[in-house]
Structure formats: C-alpha cells, structure tokens
Design a protein with these regions (language model features):
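Short, Lys/Arg-enriched segments at the junction into DNA-binding effector domains
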Residues: 4-7, 121-137
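The feature encodes the CheY-like receiver
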Residues: 18, 60, 78, 90, ...
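His-Asp phosphorelay/catalytic-motif detector in bacterial-type signaling
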Residues: 49-51, 75-81
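Active-site residues of response regulator receiver
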Residues: 56, 86
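Short hydrophobic/Thr-rich beta-strand motif most characteristic of the beta2 strand and flanking loop
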Residues: 29-38, 44
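Charged docking surfaces used in two-component/phosphorelay signaling
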Residues: 19-27
Length: 137
C-alpha cells in the first residue's frame, strides 16, 4: 500500500514561479496547493493540514516575515516546516528569516533540483522518529 502524498502549501504571487514549482513538486510525488496572497494562505492553513509551507516574503497583502512571526506564535502552526523562497538573498535577510523561525531559506532564482532536495531534507528533518528507527538505543 502506498503512503499518501505529503501536502505542501506554496504562498507566492508569481504565477509562473508557482506553476513551475508546483509542477516540479507534483512530478516528485507531492500534493501542492498554492495561494497568491497571505490572506489566501492563512485561510488554507486554517482549513487544511499541511506537511510543509513554502513562503515568499514579499506579497501584495503583507510581509512574509510578519506572517512567519504569526505562524510561530500559533500552537497549530508553530512546528510546521517552513522554507522561505524569496528574492531577498543578502546574508542578513537569510539570518533574519532563520531567526524568525524559517527552517530553510532559498533565494530566487533557484534550480528546481535544489528546491526539491531542500523540500525532501525539510520533510525528513520534520519526520517523527520512532523507537524502531532509533538504532542507537
């Protein structure tokens, strides 16, 4: 029996990037929903359960950093794995994103294979470890 596809939410207002990222992740076996605004993303997060969030920082209705603060302050989304995808690529931008609670940070433009590798690593790190998996016990 096949495990259900892991669900990802992509919040980004760039329709071309959203289509490219969505296609690449779907081809890798993930279920991908997208939202073009923070308000749409917030509504999806309240209505659905996701395994990870991919978030642009510069959106028409707000700042992704403020959105991240709110996510990390909410018990329901506090531990949701978060990958920031943004044109803000300076070292201080990455540091601020990570300090606010992002689990990873990928500046645009990026290679689709790198995005896929980072999503896999993000989900692997977030996976619960069972006693059977703990070989050091």
């Amino acid at each position: 029996m096949t495990a259900p596809a892991q669900r990802l939410l992509l919040i980004d207002d760039d329709a071309r990037l959203t289509a490219m990222v969505g296609d690449n992740l779907r081809n890798a076996g993930y279920q991908v929903d997208s939202a073009p605004t923070l308000a749409d993303g917030r509504a999806r997060l309240q209505a659905e359960s996701y395994d990870a969030l991919l978030l642009d920082l510069m959106l028409p209705d707000g700042d992704g950093l403020d959105f991240t603060r709110a996510l990390r302050g909410d018990a329901r989304t506090r531990r949701l794995p978060l990958l920031m995808l943004t044109a803000r690529g300076e070292p201080m931008d990455r540091i601020v994103g990570l300090e606010l609670g992002a689990d990873d940070y990928l500046p645009k433009p990026f290679e689709p294979r790198e995005l896929l590798a980072r999503v896999k690593a993000l989900l692997r790190r977030a996976a619960p470890v069972s006693a059977a998996d703990d070989v050091l016990a």
